[in-house]
Each structure stands twice: as C-alpha cells, then as structure tokens.
Amino acid sequence: MTARDRNRRWAVRGAVHRAVAVATTFPLVAHLGDRIAIGREPAATVPFFNLWSLPWTAQRLPHLLHGWWDAPIFWPARGTYANSELQPLTGLAFALLRPLIGPVAAYGVILLLALVANGAVT
C-alpha cells in the first residue's frame, strides 16, 4: 500500500466519522451556538455539569490549575472536584475555542471533535 492509498483511506475514514458524529447529534450542527446536546437522557444534568466544568478548567489554566480541586460548585467542601470527571485537555480546547465562538458553540464543537476522534482510534 502506498502513502497515497493510506492518506486516501484516512481521508475517507475521517469523512465517515464526521458524518456519523453530525448524524448522531442532529440537530446540534444547526443550533451549535444556542443549544446543547443531551442525547436521550430525560435530564440534561451531565451536559450542564460539563458546560460548567469546562469553563472552570479554562479559568484555572492560567493559574496552572491552582485551586482546581476546590471548585466553587462544591463549596464549602474542599478537594471534591477530584470526584468528578476531570477533563483537563478538553478544558484546554474549550479555553481556546470559547473566546472565538462562545461557550455553547465551543461545547458543541468539542463534543463533535470527541466523537470523531473516538471513531478514528477504534
């Protein structure tokens, strides 16, 4: 197999994964800046918590994550953020995207990118 064939195969796989990500989250792409995907859950607890935790992580990044474990959502308890689903790399991506497209759209783009990346490595 030549390098050109491998590149073509990766391009096709990438297109398929992008299409599947868009299809499984439809109509997210049409409402990227004003809606969040909640899937088939009856309550949006996880997406809303993620939409809170990503800005928290982004806020702590300039401080080298100092105080990250003491998230104000769990106040007055200290260190309890460690019991959550920590997403430092996702928080970094959110910190870069949020100023450009807003928090809700950044969350949607990160969700789509995560689905595409998940498909690419399986």
Each language-model region and where it sits:
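Transmembrane alpha-helical segments of multipass membrane enzymes and assembly factors
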Residues: 121-122
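Membrane-interface coil-to-helix junctions
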Residues: 22-118
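Start-transfer (signal-anchor) and selected internal transmembrane alpha helices
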Residues: 1-30
